[in-house]
C-alpha cells in the first residue's frame, strides 16, 4: 500500500513540476508580448486544451484573443458549426449565408506565436463578434 501511495506522489510531483515549468515559460512569452500574470491561468488552460481561447483586447470591429497554437483547431470548429472555411495563407474566412454571422474572419498574428499559444484577431462583416460568442454559436 505504501508503495502505491509513494508512486502516486512521485507521479503527481512530476506532473506538477511539468506544469510549473511550462507555466513559467508561458509567462515569459506573455510578458514579451505585453501581457501579464492576469492572463497566465487562462493561457495555461488554452495550452492544456481546456479552453478554446479568451479575449485580451477589443476594438470597434474586432476581438483579439489568445488561442491555441494550432490554427486548424478553429477551422474544424467553424466546420462543425456549419461554416464553409477558405484559408488564404494564414488567414481564414468562414462563410454561411444561413447563419447570424454570414462571414467570420480569423487572422493569427504571425509575430505573436509560440509553441503554447497564439494571438488571433476575429471579426465579422455582420457586426462585432468575440471568441466567446463564436463558441456559443450553433
Task: Give the positions of each predicted feature.
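Short linear interaction motif-like sites in intrinsically disordered regions of transcription factors
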Residues: 2, 48, 114-117
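Intrinsically disordered, low-complexity prosegments and terminal tails associated
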Residues: 2, 33-40, 129-138
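Short hydrophobic helices that act as membrane-entry/anchoring signals
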Residues: 2-6, 31, 42-46
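Intrinsically disordered, low-complexity regions enriched in Ser/Pro/Gly/Gln/His and often acidic
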Residues: 11, 40, 76, 105-109
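Membrane-interface motif at the C-terminal end of an N-terminal transmembrane signal
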Residues: 14-35
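Mature extracytoplasmic domains of secretory-pathway proteins
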Residues: 39-97
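Non-cytosolic head/periplasmic domains of membrane-anchored proteins
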Residues: 89-138
